[in-house]
Amino acid sequence: MSQPDTPAVKISRHTIVSGGSVLDAVYAEPTSVPIRCVLLICHGIGEIVDRWLPVQRLLAANGAASLVFDYSGYGRSRGRVTAAQFEDDAVAAFQHLQTLAPNAPTALLGFSLGTGVAAAAICRTDAQRLVLCAGFPSFEAAAWSFGIPRWWTRLVPPIWRIEESLRGCSIPILVVHGENDRMFPLKLGKELHALCGTGAKLHIASMYGHNEPFRDPRLDYWGPIVDWLAGDRTADTMELQTLLSGAQRARDTL
């Protein structure tokens, strides 16, 4: 795969109406290589679109067009901060993305707490694939991982339960989780994968922590995702890529 600065990448800013909210979004697309796939990225709750631009450039350089948006009340976006509104925002952003790239296969990708949003919104879109990165099986499980005592469970809203969100969902699902994720340990990633159905694939990113994939985007993390979205690789090849990338990162630390 090519390096991010090889092909030209076009970046554009967009405003999206989501009910009573107005969302800020950034779209990145390749201009020197064909578009292999298109994806909407639901980022983590503590992030904003500008921090995802390096990821978008890397994706575009390798044939993946992407739209990243800020939820209502985040960054430049205006509106009420609620879980239901975040889900509405994802649906509105997905519909907007389809107008930008109408002839390409379109997927939904959630990262961190954005996995809850993406999974909850997926059945309200016609996305062809779903990717859940650095995620969790339920918001309660995420809260416990943050350190909230289990006896405070009644204070945690019963939202973003993957099993409920994906009930009846039949599209291909890829779960990606960092081997060294401390915020949402690998155990949560495996639990998430188990709830996604027998056809879901699990890709363990060797030696990756929680925030590394967007703070320091590299092809050994994002490359297999693009390949899977484009339908270029089988599960066995992805497992081989996992081993090879882990070996390379191990050598880099020596």
Feature names for model-found ranges:
Residues 169-170, 175-177, 181:
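Short beta-strand/loop motif that positions the catalytic acidic residue
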Residues 55, 162, 171, 185-194:
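Short alpha-helix in the alpha/beta-hydrolase fold that links the catalytic acid
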Residues 1-17, 24-26, 234-254:
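An N-terminal hydrophobic leader/cap segment in hydrolases
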